[in-house]
Regions:
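Signal peptide-proximal N-terminal region
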Residues: 1-15
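Periplasmic-binding protein-like
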Residues: 35-47, 65-67, 104-110, 154-173, ...
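A short, well-structured beta->alpha microelement
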Residues: 12-31, 127-154
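An alpha-beta-alpha
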Residues: 84-135
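Extracellular/periplasmic periplasmic-binding protein-like sensory domains
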Residues: 173-248
Length: 311
């Protein structure tokens, strides 16, 4: 459907779709039977293993786009569309540093995330550090109890970093923090790495909303874009709202087609242009090794049970 959007500008796109069937043998056969040097751009495969297999078999002159997954490969023909974790970390930290409202800062982490906790502590030296409980056997329980944080928070604004990849710990901490919120104590929960632990079925949306959960994200929410033409067409065709993956596919493909048409994929000016679509924004920067990476992201906030873009 991104190609349909592009065609309204009077520009034809010759599109070929190849189904790897998530099978290495099928992928190998496709690579053997097709001349991919005839294409301006190759988007995918979607999974990291399949993508890595393809990139090792494709000539360097073919630009290959990693749409949904990250790859550790550093080939100069790869266009990395997923922002790196360190960029998301820096964006969240920068947002907090620019905040002019005074707040006490706290860092809560499990032992597996001590390194990032210490990193945040170096940036905010006055922040108070807390770690999950270690049992008598020396095992991290990835839990804390109410008494561990009792009398910790001050009247006014309290900003709490939660650094973990454990869903149970997120559930545990968000519940405890929520119990401290009252008319005089405000608690804002944030993280520098919103992973799947923050999205599990055990996570209370009410708690996260009540804590005004802030986080960095590669995409924004569709909730305010239901009147978008693409969303309407997709809903009409498939009788459902598009998933974040379908929207990313649309945004990413449309952006690359426009950049390809303008010659930006072969231009040093590529890093000067930021574009934004339904849920995604793109600003590619060529690093010291000549590799293109997307350096655009969002800051989102959970408020009144809705996701709001704040930066």
């Amino acid at each position: 459907m991104a190609v349909d959007s592009f065609s309204k500008y009077g520009i034809d796109v010759d599109l070929s779709v190849f189904d790897t069937a998530a099978d290495k043998n099928v992928t190998h056969k496709l690579l053997q039977e097709n001349d991919f040097t005839a294409y301006d751009l190759l988007i995918g495969p979607l999974t990291s293993n399949a993508f890595d297999f393809v990139i090792k078999s494709i000539p360097d002159e073919v630009k290959v786009v990693s749409p949904l997954s990250k790859t550790k490969l550093e080939n100069i023909n790869i266009i990395h569309t997923i922002p790196e974790d360190h960029l998301l970390f820096n964006k969240m930290i920068s947002y907090i540093e620019k905040d002019t409202i005074r707040s006490e800062k706290f860092i809560i982490a499990d032992s597996y995330n001590k390194e990032v906790s210490d990193k945040i502590k170096r940036i905010f030296p006055n922040a108070h550090q807390f770690f999950s409980e270690i049992n008598d056997s020396g095992i991290d329980t990835r839990t804390m109890v109410y008494d561990s944080l009792d009398s910790t928070f001050v009247k006014g604004r309290n900003l709490v970093f939660l650094e973990t990849k454990d869903q149970g710990f997120v559930s545990n901490i968000s519940s405890i923090l929520n119990s401290f919120v009252n008319d005089t104590i405000e608690i804002i929960l944030t993280t520098t790495n919103k992973n799947r632990a923050f999205e599990g079925t055990n996570i209370s949306n009410y708690y996260m909303s009540n804590l005004n959960f802030h986080y960095p994200s590669i995409n924004r929410s569709i909730s305010t874009y239901k009147d978008n033409n693409f969303v309407k067409k997709y809903s009409s065709r498939y009788n459902d709202y598009p998933s974040k993956y379908a929207i990313r596919g649309h945004d990413l493909t449309l952006d690359l087609l426009i950049r390809l048409r303008c010659g930006e994929l072969d231009s040093n000016n590529l890093n000067l242009v930021q574009s934004e679509y339904i849920e995604n924004r793109f600003r590619y920067v060529k690093d010291k090794d000549g590799i293109y990476r997307n350096n655009s992201a969002y800051i989102m906030k959970f408020q009144n049970l809705e996701l709001i873009q704040i930066e």
